[in-house]
A protein has these predicted regions:
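Polar low-complexity intrinsically disordered regions
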Residues: 2-162
Length: 162
């Protein structure tokens, strides 16, 4: 799927309210990880954050841009903001595949076949599923960033002056 298709799909999910759970997860993640995110902003280590920090200190980028870059870096590094929900949703996807198999063969799916289906789903779809989830998270972040920039930059304005 081209990036235009990805963006269109994300906009559709947003409009239908399908990303609300991720909104709540992201809110909790940011609030639970304020110290880590602020540390990344202050120290700028890894994932290009050191360059963003240097540019911020020279006045080349503003608070919002620094926060945006650092939060995106933390999300990319973690790959999730709610591992439990991600696992549950992946299990749900696997259960749908098991159901499809049951419908196809017109009988209950045995434990051994269920395991095969789960392994097959994991090898064929898990990495793309996680990539899509990260796209969703970054999209939600983009939509909600203005709410979090003030929370994350509480102490940063004084740091640039010194």
């Amino acid at each position: 799927m081209a990036m235009g298709g990805v963006l269109s799909s994300l906009e559709d999910c947003w409009a239908k309210g399908q990303l609300r759970d991720l909104e709540h997860d992201l809110d909790r993640f940011i609030r639970d990880n304020l110290v880590e995110i602020r540390r990344v902003m202050a120290e700028g280590r890894g994932s290009g954050t050191e360059i963003a920090r240097r540019r911020f200190m020279r006045g080349e980028i503003n608070d919002h841009q620094l926060v945006d870059f650092c939060v995106r870096a933390v999300l990319r590094k973690r790959g999730t903001c709610n591992p439990r929900r991600d696992i549950q949703e992946q299990c749900y996807e696997i259960e749908k595949e098991v159901w499809y198999e049951g419908e196809r063969v017109q009988r209950p799916v045995g434990a051994e076949r269920r395991e095969e289906i789960a392994r097959s789903w994991a090898s064929q779809h898990a990495s793309k599923w996680r990539e899509w989830r990260l796209f969703q998270l970054l999209y939600v972040w983009e939509k909600k960033a203005d709410l979090y920039v003030p929370i994350l930059t509480v102490n940063d304005a004084s740091e640039r002056k010194s």
